[in-house]
Each structure stands twice: as C-alpha cells, then as structure tokens.
Amino acid sequence: MYAVVKTGGKQYKVSVGEKLKVEQIPAQLDSQIELTEVLMIADGESVKVGAPFIEGAKVTAKVVAHGRGEKVRIFKMRRRKHYQKRQGHRQNFTQIEIVAIA
C-alpha cells in the first residue's frame, strides 16, 4: 500500500515505515502529525485518485528530526565590470517516518 501526499509544495510517494525529508514543519520531535492533502491511495489492485484531494483520507507520520540541508553556493558575476557576489543557502527540513495510511 502506498499514497501520494502533498506537503511543502511538493508531492511525495510514501508507504508505511518509510522515512523522508520534507520542507520544515512546525512540530515537536516525536510528535504525530497528520498529512491531509492526500492525492492518491493505491492498495493492491484498487486505486483511489482525488480531484484534487481524497476526502477523509489522511497519512499519519511521526517527526523524527529537524535539520538543515547541505549548503548551496551561489556565485553571480558581471563580466568586465568587476562585480562578483558570493552567497550560500541552507534549507531547513523535517525528517518524518510514515506510521499509517488511512
């Protein structure tokens, strides 16, 4: 059984027991969260597709960790103008573990 959920502006294919990193969610460590924006649920041969979401469907997940991703380096330069700009960015993330799909 698997589901497709939307969180943080992205879509993820998830199944029970799977761990994944999503955009930062304001929740405490070891707390349970419910992802209610479920786009699709597949269980063997039966497949439910929402328009856009499936009513009453939810995916329960446990918050495992919060952290920051790897640094992305940005370098801007204008040729012949002696303009150079260096910048870095680290995106915050939340690691979750899927507990149940309903």
UniProtKB/Swiss-Prot annotation:
The keyword DNA repair does not apply. InterPro entries: bL21-like, bL21-like_sf, Ribosomal_bL21, Ribosomal_bL21_CS. Signal peptide: none annotated. Coiled coil: none annotated. It comes from the Bacteria. The keyword RNA-binding applies. GO terms for biological process: translation. Pfam families: Ribosomal_L21p (PF00829). GO terms for molecular function: rRNA binding; structural constituent of ribosome. One of its GO terms (cellular component) is ribonucleoprotein complex. Keywords: Ribonucleoprotein, Ribosomal protein, RNA-binding, rRNA-binding. Belongs to the bacterial ribosomal protein bL21 family. PANTHER family: 50S RIBOSOMAL PROTEIN L21, LARGE RIBOSOMAL SUBUNIT PROTEIN BL21M. Part of the 50S ribosomal subunit. Contacts protein L20. NCBIfam families: L21. This protein binds to 23S rRNA in the presence of protein L20. This is Large ribosomal subunit protein bL21. The gene is rplU.
